[in-house]
Amino acid sequence: MIIGSIKEREHSETRAALTPIVVQKLVAMGHTVVLEKHIGKLSGYTDSEYIKSGTQILNSAQEVYSKAQIILQILPPPPSLTKNLTSKQILIADFNEITSSKYSTKAKILRLERVPRTSVAQSIDILSSQSTVRGYMGALYALYHAERIAPQIMTAAASLKAASALVVGASLTGLQASSYLKKAGCRVTLSDINPQNKDLAASVGANFSSASSFDEITALLKNKDFIFTAASTSKKSLSIITREMFPFIKPHTVVIDTTATNIDIKENVSNHHFYFHRNRYFERLAPQTATELWANNMLHLLQIISPENHLNLTDNRIIPMLL
């Protein structure tokens, strides 16, 4: 089949849907791959690398979409690029919060964010792979912006205590952040409302708390050098850390929110007595790694939906993802 992908149109997106190595494997499977020129520029891959892997590089997005039967993207492209797609094509992307009423195209749509969270679907789970990078890069970002170092150090001049970190949410992002902060030398507490996640906290070397009330959460916030939120959210989710809790956060604490709602701050500005930064896409800070993982997810997905070089969308792992 003909597989195509174009440069991402979201201005802050650094990832690409395919790597040269995955392209090489797809070509070996009998597929044809067509890509827009400079598709991998922001993720560290050159057109010449793609060409050596068997890619056909085309000059425009329209050329790619006019040829491709299967279209792979990180995020859905703007309607101006999809208006001419046909029902014989399939568009595969992370549609996140975009509903069918807000996105109109004649092409079939496969929503990657709806991948079943089961062991048999792990190889195509872009949420898990990207969350892993998000947690690592978010923790690294926090450490970089701190006014102190993390580990306990004993010198002739003085003994430095280990930094104290609170991670809220035992999601994959939260677990990866906890693991990296621990390795960096922090004393880490992982908080989650589900007490069954205590073992997950232990697996990354963190203490565990199931704090849920105002008093319990504010007690956890006190004297922390790092606060990192990664709890699962929905559109109706309430903030876990509210403005009434801000006075309990000590000055110069680095506060990182990897969600839209975990912390009750609307603007992504640091005009508080602590340093605040919100980024739902920390994985974009490591685009080569994030792209490598995404592309391998797509390789496994294509092995499922086009095993004999023709489209088959009847697999139980795929049906929940169809729009």
Q: For the regions a protein language model found, what residue spans apply to each?
A:
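Glycine-rich phosphate/diphosphate-binding loop of Rossmann-like nucleotide-binding domains
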Residues: 6-42, 146-229
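An N-terminal-biased, well-structured beta-alpha scaffold segment characteristic
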Residues: 4-108
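ADP-ribose/adenylate-binding Rossmann-like module
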Residues: 86-103, 108-112, 226-277
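Generic hydrophobic/aromatic pocket-lining and core-packing "Φ" positions
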Residues: 23, 47, 82, 139, ...
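Rossmann-like NAD(P)-binding element
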Residues: 63-79, 209-242, 254
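Adenosine-phosphate binding glycine-rich loop
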Residues: 115, 119-153, 261-323
